[in-house]
Amino acid sequence: MNAMAKLIMVQGTSSNVGKSILVTALCRIFKQDGYKVAPFKSQNMALNAFVTQEGGEIGRAQAVQAEACGIAPSVDMNPILMKPEADSKSQIVVNGKVDRTISAREYYEYAPLLLDTALAALNRLREQNDIVVIEGAGSPAEINLRQREIVNMRIAKTAGAPVLLAGDIDRGGVFASLIGTIDLLEPEERSYVKGYLINKFRGDASLLKPAIDVLEDRTSIPVLGIIPYLRNMAIAQEDSVYLDECKSGLGETDLDIAVIRLPRISNYDDFDALATDGASVRFVSKTGEIGNPDLIIIPGTKSTIPDMEYLWQNGLAETIIKKAGKGTHVLGVCGGYQILGKMIYDPHKTESETTELKGLGLLDTETTFEKEKSTTQVSGQVRFNNGLLADMAGCEVGGYEIHMGRTRLFTAQPAFQITKTPKGPADYLDGASNAEGTVLGTYIHGIFESDSFRRGFLNAIRRYKGIPERQAGYFDRDKEYDKLADIVRASIDMNKIYDILNEGIR
């Protein structure tokens, strides 16, 4: 192909229609077909973040899409990241670094100034690849945002990207939403839409033909694919809707894991890998839903103090404390690790007006929020050797850190030794455990993608439970990307999509 990559864009009739997973699939298909491909989303509002090798933050979805492309994630793939915080404000990350925290109204005054930043990032990707697959956000028909949006039709028009419009048939009303979206677009914008993708279909696709005929007749835009509802895909999803589904491994499960669904939950895909090794992973938001799990996980959160307040207010805090007192294992990751401690301090009011709050007190630690955020990839080893980490001293771990808090240990024991970051050798401690090893905290996101660590961690729980250990399943996301690509390729007209890609906008 030419020096500047060709473009194709996936927009949707609303949030949660499956844009991210469709972009992931297209990225993998183009890679399978021998092209050098990269994903791009100019502006992403998400709590799921990833840290690149350079230490920059991007949306987790773009990191997944990059992985499907077979390339390392970069900040150019998501130059503007919005991370919602408490009090209707968002932290704005530009080119991987925190830029400011502002309200929604302030952001939409500010956003047009970031268009050049987004386009510069896109152009850098175009110079390095054959194809760039662009993802939109929400809907292009949000007429109240039309003048200030920089993620849907403004990107398509400025960059010259043909658009595939996706709709979710599973929730009903897909034909009304597709026709309504087209009707609300400006005439010039409509000319960019080259085809429809009907996503999340269950049943006999031939039954849709009468409705498809009406859709195509009314809009003069063809339906290019009907993609089935995807189940049991070990691929991280952008939207939290999929948290309602229990994730179980293949075959029988012998461990029950309850993840607390915090209001501002982040990086919830940290635990996908656990479901490949005989564990059921379910997200719970009420005390009555916890039951009697083998492990309670408190996940990451964008706003630790407001979510800690939530745990106290609805009784979840007391339930977790009682369960831990009776021997239930508890794990906290990032914000969840901070919640496990005795106190959380926010002297700079980074998260809210609350400057200090009592934690669960399950670890003898205290966390203080600082002004600077730590964002880095890490690798290291298990240091502690009891309970959840029994017989695992020296086991290699890896992942990435995103946090503004600094946690101080008192009688709690350090859990991990960090030995390397992208900057070179490192020598510092991470995480903490109680003496018995039944309560564990860490700042490392993605720690369970290590097969050996995951096996040892889950088998420690099995030994405590008195059931046989298991060999680790191989968490092969590469295989999952191929599976996704095969399903989507079989469901869409790739010949027509290649025609659209090559013709561009005419």
Curated annotation (Swiss-Prot):
> Keywords of this protein's UniProt record, alphabetized?
Cobalamin biosynthesis, Glutamine amidotransferase
GO terms, biological process: cobalamin biosynthetic process
Please give the pathway this protein is involved in.
Answer: Cofactor biosynthesis; adenosylcobalamin biosynthesis
An annotated Gene Ontology molecular function: ABC-type vitamin B12 transporter activity
Active site per the UniProt annotation: C334, H445
Entries under InterPro entries matching the protein: Class_I_gatase-like, CobQ/CobB/MinD/ParA_Nub-bd_dom, CobQ_GATase1, CobQ_N, CobQ_synth, GATase_3, P-loop_NTPase
Record's keyword annotation contains Repeat: no
**Domain of life (superkingdom):** Bacteria
Q: Where are the transmembrane segments?
A: none
Q: Domain GATase cobBQ-type: where?
A: 254-453
Q: Which family does it belong to?
A: Belongs to the CobB/CobQ family. CobQ subfamily.
The record ties this protein, via NCBIfam families, to: cobQ (TIGR00313), PRK00784.1 (NF001989)
Briefly, what is this protein's role? Catalyzes amidations at positions B, D, E, and G on adenosylcobyrinic A,C-diamide. NH(2) groups are provided by glutamine, and one molecule of ATP is hydrogenolyzed for each amidation.
Mind telling me what this protein is named?
Cobyric acid synthase
Q: Which organism is it from?
A: Dehalococcoides mccartyi (strain ATCC BAA-2266 / KCTC 15142 / 195)
Gene encoding the protein: cobQ
